Amino acid sequence: MELLAPAGNMEKMKMALLYGADAVYMAGKAFGLRAYGGNFTREEMKEAVEYAHFMGKKVYITVNIIPRNEDLEGLDTYLKYLQDIHADAVLISDLGVFDIAREAAPDLPVHVSTQASAANWRTVRRWKDMGASRVVLAREVSLSEMADIRKRVNIELEVFGHGALCISWSGRCLLSNYFTNGKRQSNRGECIQACRFKYSVMEESRPGQYFPVEEDEHGTYIFNSKDLCMIDHIPELIEAGVSSLKIEGRMKSVYYVAAVVAAYRKAIDSYYELGAEFSVRPEWREELEKVSHRPYTTAFAFQNPDHSAQEYMKSQPEQPYDFIGLVLEQHKENGTVKVQQRNYFKAGEVVECLTPAGDVFPVTIGHLTNKDGEEAAAAPHPLEELTMVTEEDLPPYTILRRRTCG
């Protein structure tokens, strides 16, 4: 089973692959559903594909907006460009875009996006008959339904296994349109995440009088889903015939992407190694608790979710750790590493490391010097690079993190 990770920009793409993803999905500056996710220029996409292929890994490009007429302009040449740079596939949700892809870039594999709401085997078979090589199933499909679809249709199936959930059916939401008077449209890449807002109730005969719904003093989070987490169910996903496990999060941090990928990499590899002897290790789940997240749920995997799949207490996710630094270079000959600051830290404090191999251990911030060779007591400046003395083995791209207060 492929491990597929989000890549909101070049740094996230490289970190995802280095921490164990088999493939990444990303968007260009147009035609994707995360207009505010950073995204890639054409030149960056070409570089990303070359980098991934050098590592023996894959890149999928999202072209999954639900377009209006004006959105179609230039799409044919864009798809042809993706074919020319040898992207491994495009993700598409719209039949018209699918047609353009077949005409303009016939050698470019097409994966059907979850936005297409493929929730049954007849729909999946129809997409296959039209030329799709993979279908990303709707998030509303259960594990048993996944297995049944795979038995009936010989095609690659991709499913979301971790990350934020949309409150609407496979993302077909108009809340952003409503709250912005049509200026921000979710299905054209401009979601404002209105499902995370705080709401109160107004009775129509009493305009201007707002009533709480007995959750807290801020209102009610009636659309606020918990986050999906399927790390405890890797065997069931593989046995159901899932070809690719997808992690949500093109707008999440570098730290989030790396840590989540590392945990799922270990779980998937462990199942393939141990088979029937496989068991879920507590440190995998602990790692997922250390990233920004809401309480976890298995959503639709085993049954239609009830009220327990919603988070009623608050809309903001937990953020138990701060990402404070990234190792850029390791110099074993003199026991130093070059670290790029991501949050304030100081010499002498004990922090935690996460390496690209997925190893986790504490380390003391050693003697620091700045780029001018001057001693530094702390690292207060965003993205400043410092040399740190350490006896630990900290390879490039190791993450330094610190537990937040409380």
Go through each PLM region and give its residues.
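Surface-exposed amphipathic alpha-helical tracts and adjacent flexible/coil segments at the periphery
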Residues: 1-18, 23-30, 49, 55-65, ...
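Glycine-rich, positively charged N-terminal anion/phosphate-binding segment
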Residues: 34-51
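Short beta-strand elements of ligand-binding domains
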Residues: 61-62, 92, 111-114
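Gly/Gly-Pro- and Ser/Thr-rich, intrinsically disordered tail segments characteristic of DNA damage-repair
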Residues: 73, 107-108, 112-121
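Alpha-helix capping/helix-boundary segments
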Residues: 96-97
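Short glycine-biased active-site loop of nucleotidyltransferases that positions the nucleotide triphosphate
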Residues: 102
